[in-house]
Amino acid sequence: MLNKCSGSLTLLAVRRFCGPCRRLHYHKDNPNNINIAKNLLNNNIQARCSTNEASWKLAQKELDLKIREYEQKLKDVKLNDINKKSPLNIPDEVWTKFISEVNSYDKEKENHLSTGNHELRRTTPLKIGPLLLTRIGLLKSKNTASNNYSVDHIVSNLANDNTLLNRQVSTEEWNSHLRHLLNIPKCFLGVDIVEIVNFFNYLPQTVISKSSLEIWKAVEESGMKVMPDLLVLLMESTNASGDFRKTVQLYHLYQKSNAPPNGLVYQSYAIALSSLGKHKDLVALYSEQKSVSITPSKDFLNACIKAFSRTKEFTKAWEVFNFMKFTATSISPSAETYGLMIQICSSQYNPEKALDLYNEMKLRPIDPLTPTTFVINNLIHALATDVRFQTVAFSLLQDLSHYGLRPNHSTLYELIRLIAYSGKLDYMKDILDNFWVRQKLLPSILKVEQIFHFIFRALISAEVQTSSVTPDYTHFKEEVRKIIDSSKEPLIPFLKRSTLTENDLFLNAIYTFEYAKRKFPEALNSRLVTDFLNIFLERGSVQLFKEIYQLEFREMSTMEGSSMKVAKITLTYIYAIKLALLFNDFEFGYAAWQEYWHCKIHKLLPKEDASYEQKVVLLTLSLLSKNKHTSLARSLLLSHLDKGWTWNKHSLGFMRKMCSVMNDQATVYLIDSITNEIGINQRFTRK
């Protein structure tokens, strides 16, 4: 009975993406899930067979509700399975294999770059006539104008070991022969277009790319129409050589020739637009392609999905994906398609959907797909920031080995990011030791400031034992100085000792910060300083935060430099006021506000991003309101209404709540007017 599920139930199942029947297949190894699916289908068999329209609609509603309940149960089961897994841990053999494979990948890449890319001619046979052979310079004959050579004569002329066709030919030689051809006026006159396509199919793509526009011009001058096959060959060659601007030029020339649209031409053009970052043009091309009766190719649709992802048009990307799954008859989503959609899930902060897509591509009943390194890298990225899925993200390293995939530099980047957000300090130290201290691989993948950002992020996320007594900042700095001065080896960006307690963590953070100041002072931008301060803010170490703010921040604020160092000051003020708000330290927060305002009034700060200033003002409004200084908060709010900022109930909600508690009806009315009425800013601007 389960195998005969049909009719409207099937349509509903498709609308729910494969419905209970396919979910039954996906979860066939889980007894709990399969029982749920069987019960769901059996309970609705009778309802499906109803002939009364009213009862049929009611049955559909019931089925829809049960499907939603079923999906929720599947979701709960999945989350329970995730939570039951072992703590974040990578088996030693998997970790060792990962380190060695990344090292071997890097060495192979270096060897490839050092040997160069000597592209040889293609292995396809050269099937062209003697006239074109003569003009190319491959066939020597007194009667160069004749095209009546016998096949045996051509073969005997080409059989000599010294001829171009019977030995490996350098790119320079092919370029020379192609220039010889293109220098002849109307060089393709009298030559069949099929022979021309065969000839260019034989040449290396770099040679074709270099002269692609001249080839187009020569074909037109010879009085021939450019066939789509030849255009696609030219565009594929320019794309393969990375000369995407020539691909765009070729497409525009093709448009001017009033030639009919071609799916492969669209595909090559889409790849070029995607590579050039012209995502808006690619979105327009997608609309143009839909208006013509041409079935799009898989590569074209993948390029469109990538464009919609870059332009943040995620709804359209899902439409293309669903078209490939449900509507298109000759194409279906590839592993690359799933990788791109997982990337979109990451942008939409939906790790659960990303994991569903990964399972779907592996378990779909028809043509299941094998994951690629690209897919797994994107899935690690999507899962890394959500604590619920970090165990699953680490287990993906085993999937790489299971499917015979090799990690690459992107895998290393995603793993460092995952380690940072999961707080696995031992793994972070191991990676830094292998790929930064022993060999300088990391700086070629990440900027130095990104590496420090991930180190600080790992220190924020790490789980350690709380220390009963925390020494002051001076004590930590003195200990760090002793470690640095007594070290006989070159400095490394982390302490090798284990980090078991909060004091160990603080010592490691201060050591890394001192290392960055000494070795990479140019990397200490606004993000890193706030990351460093955020370690103590997140740990609730108010006293250490204050000491670092007073000593390190003041020290940096006197440094001469660019607006980046000014942004550093502004962001640090934000963190100082935020700490005062969280830990009820009004004096510290108000002093930080006054210092910021002093620098701003006396123009000690260059013009900065408006969002920074608004953030400082909003935090100060909350700080004043929380400490019952509502009149000061109202004055501060009124003085900034002419800034053109967006005010809403969320940003002013805390201030309104505190003013309501204080029975300050004037300020409550002011906030309600600002957040509810259009043009209210004109009423409350300064005279």
UniProtKB/Swiss-Prot annotation:
GO BP terms: namely:
mitochondrial gene expression; mRNA processing; RNA splicing
Record GO cellular component, one term: mitochondrion
What domain of life does the UniProt record list for this protein's source?
Eukaryota
Phenotype of null mutants: Impairs growth on galactose and leads to thermosensitivity on glucose-containing media.
Q: Where is the transit peptide?
A: 1-49
Keywords from UniProt, A to Z, are: Mitochondrion, mRNA processing, mRNA splicing, Repeat, Transit peptide
> Where is this chain's protein located in or outside the cell?
Mitochondrion
In the record for this protein, the PPR repeats are positioned at 262-296, 297-331, 334-368, 372-407
What PROSITE patterns is this protein classified in?
PPR
- Say yes or no: keyword Ribonucleoprotein present: no
Q: Does the keyword Transit peptide apply?
A: yes
The subunit field of the Swiss-Prot or TrEMBL record says: Binds to mitochondrial small subunit 15S rRNA.
UniProt function note: Regulates mitochondrial small subunit maturation by controlling 15S rRNA 5'-end processing. Localizes to the 5' precursor of the 15S rRNA in a position that is subsequently occupied by mS47 in the mature yeast mtSSU. Uses structure and sequence-specific RNA recognition, binding to a single-stranded region of the precursor and specifically recognizing bases -6 to -1. The exchange of Ccm1 for mS47 is coupled to the irreversible removal of precursor rRNA that is accompanied by conformational changes of the mitoribosomal proteins uS5m and mS26.
Tell me its family. Answer: Belongs to the CCM1 family.
Its UniProt miscellaneous note says:
Involved in mitochondrial-nuclear incompatibility, a major determinant in reproductive isolation between species, through hybrid incompatibility of Ccm1 and its interacting partner 15S rRNA between yeast species.
What's the protein name?
Answer: Mitochondrial 15S rRNA processing factor ppr3
Q: Which organism is it from?
A: Schizosaccharomyces pombe (strain 972 / ATCC 24843) (Fission yeast)
